[in-house]
């Protein structure tokens, strides 16, 4: 008599079949679009990877050491980072590191290309922030692997789904910071710039 109060009811909600059918429908009807997009992104990623592979290992380490010195004003940190980079190569992972770096550079480029215009538009339209903020909050709280699942389902495994998942995750701070930065410009500066044309 009280079993329905203690045990969860047997509802048997099946969402796997509709999702499988939707993915199958997308792949059948729009598969060529995804294949073309995957090829274009692969060419872009491989181009960056090829450019990174052309940089000699010793030059890459020196660039990291001197960039760290310039940015952090510390040779000690530069030498540490250079040593760690050397260890990556010594362990035989130099090419894999370049592949990962190419994925990250590609994701950063696309995040900026997508996020900057959206952030500018959000700053220009009053009230849009109240609509978009919950969406951005939800996007930022999800782990990147959540975005990887649909990307792999539609594009297959590889570098391109990794780039797409990273872009979706990284575009949120770009949008937020662009919008916030534009809104925080002092009104007197805006008026002065308008008066000068």
Region spans (language model):
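Alpha-helical transmembrane segments of multipass membrane proteins
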Residues: 65-67, 85-86, 116-121, 148-150, ...
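Transmembrane-helix boundary motif in ABC transporter permease subunits
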Residues: 66-70, 88-95, 107-136
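Alpha-helical transmembrane segments and their helix-entry boundary regions
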Residues: 77-80, 96, 119, 130, ...
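Loop-to-helix entry region at the N-terminal start of transmembrane alpha-helices
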Residues: 95-111, 137, 144-174
């Amino acid at each position: 008599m009280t079993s329905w109060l203690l045990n969860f009811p047997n509802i048997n909600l099946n969402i796997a079949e509709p999702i499988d059918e939707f993915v199958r429908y997308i792949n059948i009807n729009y598969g060529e679009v995804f294949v073309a997009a995957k090829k274009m992104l692969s060419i872009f990623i491989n181009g960056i990877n090829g450019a990174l592979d052309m940089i000699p290992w010793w030059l890459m380490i020196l660039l990291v050491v001197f960039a760290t010195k310039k940015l952090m004003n510390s040779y000690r940190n530069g030498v540490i980072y250079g040593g760690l980079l050397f260890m990556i190569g010594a362990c035989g992972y130099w090419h894999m590191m370049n592949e990962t770096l190419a994925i990250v550079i590609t994701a950063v480029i696309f995040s900026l290309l997508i996020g900057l215009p959206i952030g500018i538009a959000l700053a220009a339209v009053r009230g849009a922030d109240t609509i978009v903020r919950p969406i951005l909050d939800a996007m930022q709280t999800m782990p990147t692997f959540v975005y990887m699942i649909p990307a792999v389902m539609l594009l297959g495994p590889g570098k391109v789904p990794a780039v797409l998942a990273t872009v979706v995750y990284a575009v949120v701070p770009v949008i937020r910071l662009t919008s916030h930065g534009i809104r925080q410009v002092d009104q007197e500066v805006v008026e002065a710039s308008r008066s000068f044309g």
